[in-house]
């Protein structure tokens, strides 16, 4: 197994154990045992559990979110179509990291001592600035903030639903786009214009 594949395998197993047992109750020793490797082999890639979690966020959430932000900043001034595409791309980003986003919400207390929470907050606030107008009314600012929250929260608030994850992601995206469309026009929520699935350039 190559170094890159070993690192990814460690991340995958760690995330599974964190979800199953909780972050605080999972040790590096248990992760190594689950992988069938020595602690020394694990330490080669990650010296601490915090390093491991940080790598997960950097690879699966922070990096992709930065790519969305970079795309948005390159497409200024922000039109409604650009705002909707920002949501489209960010929805795909979250969809590709569903287990990690769920972990983030379920382990907020444990993550508070790490820099991850603050880094994620920074990205979300940056995205919020990109999808709302500077002179937006307070109600429209709330709509834009609610759009981002909707995409995050739907992943775990509808766990009892029979819909598959992709259907829930698309439904949350549709609602988020309706909210941002309403905020852009300064009116009550209405259907968002048609947009394709996430298009990466």
Feature annotation, model-predicted:
Residues 9, 13, 17-51, 55:
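Helix-turn-helix
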């Amino acid at each position: 197994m190559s170094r890159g594949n070993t690192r990814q395998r460690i991340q995958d197993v760690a995330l599974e154990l964190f979800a199953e047992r909780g972050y605080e109750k999972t040790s590096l020793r248990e992760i190594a045992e689950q992988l069938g490797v020595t602690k020394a082999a694990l330490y080669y890639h990650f010296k601490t559990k915090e390093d491991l979690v940080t790598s997960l966020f950097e690879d699966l959430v922070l990096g992709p979110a930065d790519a969305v932000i970079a795309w948005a900043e390159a497409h200024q001034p922000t039109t409604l179509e650009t705002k909707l595409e920002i949501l489209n791309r960010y929805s795909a980003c979250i969809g590709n990291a569903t287990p990690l986003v769920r972990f983030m919400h379920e382990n907020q207390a444990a993550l508070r001592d790490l820099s991850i929470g603050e880094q994620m907050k920074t990205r979300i606030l940056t995205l919020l600035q990109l999808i709302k107008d500077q002179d937006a009314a307070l109600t429209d600012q709330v709509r834009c903030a609610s759009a981002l929250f909707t995409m995050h929260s739907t992943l775990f608030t509808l766990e009892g639903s029979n819909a598959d994850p992709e259907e829930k992601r698309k439904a949350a995206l549709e609602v988020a786009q309706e909210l941002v469309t309403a905020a852009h026009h300064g009116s009550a929520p209405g259907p968002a214009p048609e947009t394709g699935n996430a298009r990466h350039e």
